[in-house]
Design a protein with these regions (language model features):
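Structural motif
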Residues: 18-29, 125-131, 357-367
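Short secondary-structure transition/capping motifs
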Residues: 36-39, 67-75, 123, 127, ...
Length: 442
């Protein structure tokens, strides 16, 4: 049984077995297939037309819009099914989770979760305060056929307190309660960690999330099996580990002598730097780095700090997992960049940014569909015996891309789909039609 048929059978069990439930399942799978086939942008209207054109299923416009805004889609169970379907999700015994936030600019009012948001990455010709949705996203980092990939696992819409105070925002009749990004991140990580109860969890973040606002709430439900890997700010102060003084009365010291700021220690550690062979950004490179175990007051525990030196710059990384080697720390943090590539795959290639929906449930369901499609694509890649060939290879880029996996998946969808989701009549005709359209698009 193929991967698509196996997952399709598990997803079918999540829907009621009555006629309405099975019709909802059929439309659910058809929507996923329409997103996965790289032919059109994933607007709701485009998806309905793609379903009619490619798969021969005509759905009334009002019925399909009602389905896309349905409150009966079992997303929690769908995500848990996908989490368990990932082959070999652990990397050296750890679950590597990338955490970051992104913005999704929109045009038009009365769009759910839109607010005036500060964009720190805005270019010179872009506004610093766009009208956009803010997404806190959790992804799974894992190597697939020799390259790091980021599989979207969960997301939350972040709404500022000022936005909620300006107007009462309701979803399904209930007022939206403010939750900061740390609380949203903790809820997603805890849910995912409970699905993998025996695995150690390493959360890889940028410097904004790398503090006790995230680490302390995570340690309460998950204990010592969760650790943090982040980048250090240059002005963070480091302390030596405390030394026990025999015979001294009173409470033992929590911190040793002050070592200085990260920038000051970087100059001192430069003479102790060594060269390591690390796989970074798709190639094995020689990295000059130095490390030291110190105390950090922002986390109130011992951390391993790694200074990575370049020609004229340096970067300081820290982790609470003292068992990680220098090479592992550098490689895992460099793999964090794949979540940024995942945002591009989700917004531009899958087309989540092009949605025109405004209703809260429709906006949320559409993003769920796009993220599930992205994760399914990478799960499909992990089940392939060998990596697909890169379509537009060059001397500097030889690894396969997300679009290459999606193209191979579209061919399998044309062959068999998810099993019981295709009507029996006209199957061969639709199969050849999809293949012809794929050839024209390519």
């Amino acid at each position: 049984m193929s991967m698509l048929r196996a997952i399709g059978g598990e997803l079918q069990c999540l829907f009621p077995m009555n006629p309405h439930g099975q019709e909802r399942f059929e439309w659910f799978v058809l929507t996923l297939k329409a997103i996965l086939v790289p032919i059109t942008v994933s607007r709701t209207s485009n998806l309905r037309r793609a379903i009619a054109t490619l798969f021969g299923v005509s759905i009334a416009e009002w019925r399909y819009d009602t389905f896309m805004a349905s409150v009966k889609l079992p997303w929690e169970a769908v995500w848990e099914t996908l989490w368990r379907a990932i082959p070999q999700p652990l990397v050296e015994g750890r679950l590597l989770l990338a955490l970051d936030d992104s913005i999704n600019p929109k045009t038009g009012r009365h769009i759910f979760a839109c607010q005036t948001t500060f964009d720190h990455a805005a270019k010179a010709n872009q506004t610093r305060w766009p009208w956009a949705q803010t997404l806190v996203t959790l992804g799974l980092l894992m190597p697939i056929h020799g390259r790091w990939c980021c599989l979207p696992m969960a997301f939350r819409f972040y709404l500022r307190r000022a936005t909620l105070q300006a107007g009462c925002l309701r979803v399904r009749g209930k007022a939206v309660v403010f939750a900061d990004k740390f609380a949203q991140a903790v809820s997603m990580i805890v849910s995912l960690a409970r699905c993998f109860q025996t695995a150690r969890v390493l959360v890889i973040t940028d410097s904004w999330f790398g503090n006790n606002g995230l680490f302390r709430p995570l340690r309460q439900p998950l204990g010592t099996r969760v650790d943090l890997l982040s980048r250090l700010r240059v002005n963070a102060v480091l302390y030596a580990q405390p030394e026990a003084v025999p015979g001294k009365l009173g409470r033992p010291r929590k911190y040793g002598a002050r070592l200085g700021s990260v920038a000051e220690c970087a100059k001192q550690q430069r003479a102790k730097a060594r060269c390591y062979q690390v796989r970074v950004y798709g190639a094995t490179r020689e990295v000059e780095a130095a490390d030291q175990v110190v105390m950090l007051k922002t986390l109130r525990c011992a951390v391993r700090v790694v200074w990575v030196y370049r020609r004229s710059q340096w970067v300081a990384l820290m982790t609470t997992d003292l068992r990680l080697s220098v090479a592992q720390i550098v490689e895992y943090y460099s793999a964090r960049w794949k979540i940024e590539a995942g945002f591009r795959e989700l917004k531009q290639e899958i087309g989540s940014a092009a949605t025109q929906t405004r209703h809260p449930d429709a906006v949320t369901n559409h993003l769920h569909f796009c993220m599930v499609a992205t994760t399914l694509t990478w799960i499909y890649a992990a089940h392939l015996k060998q990596a697909p060939a890169r379509r537009y290879a060059s001397q500097s880029t030889t690894e396969y891309a997300f679009a290459d996996v999606r193209r191979a998946l579209a061919k399998d969808i044309a062959e068999e789909g998810f099993g019981s989701d295709c009507p029996k009549s006209g199957k061969a005709q639709r199969k050849s039609f999809i293949s012809e359209v794929m050839r024209l698009v390519a």
